[in-house]
């Protein structure tokens, strides 16, 4: 798989309060493409960051219905991946991809 395809799999790091809490357990959270599979996510993280991945857990957050000035809209669905790294491995997501 080429580097360009790896960048299509990993959309962005998810920087939230919960993701900073799980970072203490050698885990990193990424927003990923909806059609990405766990093996693709594992291969992309290992290739782009040069780390060993032990597990990948995914979740699909459904978009919320929101109102703006009386008009009803919907946020997009987001797929997230919680990537568990091997012992002693780290990724600094604050510097960007």
Swiss-Prot record:
Stated name of the protein: Large ribosomal subunit protein uL23
Domain of life: Bacteria
Entry keyword RNA-binding: yes
Role, per record: One of the early assembly proteins it binds 23S rRNA. One of the proteins that surrounds the polypeptide exit tunnel on the outside of the ribosome. Forms the main docking site for trigger factor binding to the ribosome.
GO molecular function: rRNA binding; structural constituent of ribosome
Pfam family, one: Ribosomal_L23
Subunit structure: Part of the 50S ribosomal subunit. Contacts protein L29, and trigger factor when it is bound to the ribosome.
Gene: rplW
Source species taxonomy: Bacteria, Pseudomonadati, Pseudomonadota, Alphaproteobacteria, Hyphomicrobiales
Alphabetically ordered keywords of this record: Ribonucleoprotein, Ribosomal protein, RNA-binding, rRNA-binding
One Gene Ontology biological process: translation
Statement: the UniProt record of this protein carries the keyword Glycosyltransferase: no
Family: Belongs to the universal ribosomal protein uL23 family.
GO cellular component: ribonucleoprotein complex; ribosome
InterPro entries assigned to the protein according to its UniProt record, in alphabetical order: Nucleotide-bd_a/b_plait_sf, Ribosomal_uL23-like, Ribosomal_uL23/eL15/eS24_sf
